[in-house]
């Protein structure tokens, strides 16, 4: 697109949403596999327990990761696995009804770092991509890095490791 290529690929994931309920979960809870799964380059299915209460009283249950392209199908076995993992941590959730499940695609860079900066081959093209599941949370920092670079200002951190140029040899 626009004469540039980055090796950004989708990582599919599922989330379960419960009915509004009593406040059982006061903080986001991750199991010990979560960090390893986020950092993994394995294309196979990985699940780890993430349970988070919302202001509306619903509880979000995840997380799964799988590199299978843009396959948008629902996988009920994965949903069952996520529910089982969550209820093993929070047995009280066994009696809570699920409202829905949804899936999405996290943009993933093979080195697990976002791509932030000016394209080395297409002048004027700036990238902010590959943040995987942290894109919304990292958006302000990514925007600040790009703004500072465009304006020629020193930024709050060195963005060299996020440069799109790190993939030049990979994409040629």
Q: Which role does the model predict for each range below?
A:
Residues 115, 119-172:
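C-terminal lid/capping helical subdomain adjacent to the catalytic/cofactor pocket in oxidative enzymes
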